[in-house]
Amino acid sequence: MPASLPGQDGGGTRTTRPRSQLRAACDSCNKSKTKCPGGNPCPLCQCSGIRCHYSVAHQLGRPKGSKNKRTLMREMQGSLGNGDASGQFQPNRIVTTAQAHISSNPSPVGSQSQQQQHPQQAGQQQQQQQQQQQQQHQQQQQQQQQQQQQQQQQQQQQQQQQQQQQQHQQQQQQQQQQQHLLPHAFSNTMQNAGTTAAYAGAEKEDSPLAMDDGELFSMLDQTLLMDTMTDEMSDFGQLVPQALPHPMTMPESLTSLLNHDTAFDATQLSNEYSTSSNSKPSTTDDSCMALPTPDSSTTHRPSSSVFGDGHITFSSGTASASRTSASSIVEQQSIPTSPVTVAPMSPAKSSSVPRTLPPATVTPTCTCLPGLVTLICQLEDLRHPPPPRHTSGQHPHQHPASPYSLKCILQGVQLAEEPWAGFARCLDAAGARKRHGAQENTVQDDDGNDHHRHALALYAMSIRIILSSIHKYRIALSMTGQQQRQHNFGDSPEDLDDAASVLVSVGGVQLAGETKSEMIKIAVRLALKQTTAALMRLLECRNRSSSAPSSATMQVAEYSVGHGRFESTAMVRDHPLPHSMSYSSLKTLAGPHTNMITGQDQLEKRENVAGMLSILQYTTKDLIDGANFDWR
């Protein structure tokens, strides 16, 4: 600050203020002699990138050559290092940049061209940045599109895989359905000898189980299997026609599958079947039925059957049939039977039967046939279960469940409920159509009657399978210890699947002891009641179709079901029976000693089920012989 001068302001002294005012123009504009618009920094310095600095007004200049270039550069580096870019006034130091020193004396024309070039460069840079951003945005869009395309391709591949899986599942379901129609009983009975005690005694003529189920199949129509179980070829439809005793004409779909080296010739098997109606009566003790026995010189039983215990082996282009017999406790029963005459059916008619009710001229096709055919297959699966596959947790000596177990009986009756009910409805509908045709004097064709006879044969076959299972189960329970091993029931008593292995639960609580036994008794009683009611339906059809009494007919009691018993209630309608079947035998059949099959039955309490099997034997014989059954 300047020193005070005396003699002023009345006090003899005066002070001076510091001159801190800045110039109106910055140093760059001042040197270039252009109008400075003002501001810190000014627009011109901002565009040119020069440091804008305002000098103090009325400042004395320094002499030329006081500072050399090295000093200026050092000061410039010092000012840059200290960050002196605020533009504030520092009186002790005046810093100039290299650009300010270089442009200390610019020409007016050059400064204006620089001012015009800087905005153009800035605009170009902005355009370039925008173009780069657009390119990046386009690249991102392309990447997103590629990702979307990849996702769509993956979805299409997944859909194709799902469709392939669905097709594979459908094929498996179709194969399972076809395999389900072919029960394991076919392969079991055709590849293995008779292993159960049921049909092991079928060779003996004193057993109610002597008639083969194959004889019932012999009366079925040729096109029955194709009409009742889709038009596709199944293993069931391939085996059953081969077991028929008469040659048949296969459809084209079947012939194409049978024309190979190992084709089975049904005509060759038919030569092994013979029929005979000669029989002679024989008598037995009072505890059993007195039924006629066949003449061994004139009667020849078929050597194979579909559901019997026959052992059939196949070779290329030929078929050989042989029957293997085994010891059975059924042989001890001394229940004789009569020979069965097999009547081959006539060729099937080519006329199609309508599915809807016509104007009272043609009888519609029986609708209960598919259910009865499926029921026979299911019952045979229960009687002949497939052998279990040995796993790590099982022992090789473990045997499958017995075909005459309590579980199989109860499950078989449960499976038969719906088909039997459908058969009853079919009987009622057929009777109504017959009465309607009689009122309007219309004639029913033979095709409808054949379908009814086929359904009735399958119905009788299902009853016979269940009754024979019950009969064998009761016999098996009466045998213990050495008798079981002697008659090939198993190596130990544990092989018999008795009531102890059946689990009974109510509301999630398992029952045991006497309560469990009572519940099992009730279930078995109901099962036997349903089977007896089904047999009664068959006998009612046979009784209504009987003609006037002859020398070979007698009054037979109409059987009713009460508390699981097969009882006689009234003497009604004539029923043709053999001469040797006495009323005492029927009385024994209808006796009250019908205890349940739950382990306490004695050997002498088996006449009831055996008698029902005998009655069923003669009823099915009438079916095979072509007897007319009343469907009203």
UniProtKB/Swiss-Prot annotation:
Residues 101-111, 270-286, 294-306, 329-340 have a biased composition (Polar residues). Keywords: DNA-binding, Metal-binding, Nucleus, Transcription, Transcription regulation. GO terms for cellular component: nucleus. Residues 112-129 have a biased composition (Low complexity). Residues 101-129, 270-311, 324-356 are annotated as: Disordered. The keyword Glycoprotein does not apply. GO terms for molecular function: DNA binding; DNA-binding transcription factor activity, RNA polymerase II-specific; zinc ion binding. Gene3D superfamilies: Zn(2)-C6 fungal-type DNA-binding domain (4.10.240.10). Transcription factor; part of the gene cluster that mediates the biosynthesis of xenovulene A, an unusual meroterpenoid that has potent inhibitory effects on the human gamma-aminobutyrate A (GABAA) benzodiazepine receptor. It is found in: Nucleus. Induction: Expression is significantly up-regulated under xenovulene A producing condition. The lineage of its organism: Eukaryota, Fungi, Dikarya, Ascomycota, Pezizomycotina. This is Transcription factor asR4. Disruption phenotype: Does not affect the production of xenovulene A. Xenovulene A is a natural product exhibiting little structural resemblance with classical benzodiazepines yet is able to displace high-affinity ligand binding to the benzodiazepine site of the gamma-aminobutyrate A (GABAA) receptor and could be potentially used as an anti-depressant with reduced addictive properties. Residues 26-52 bind DNA.
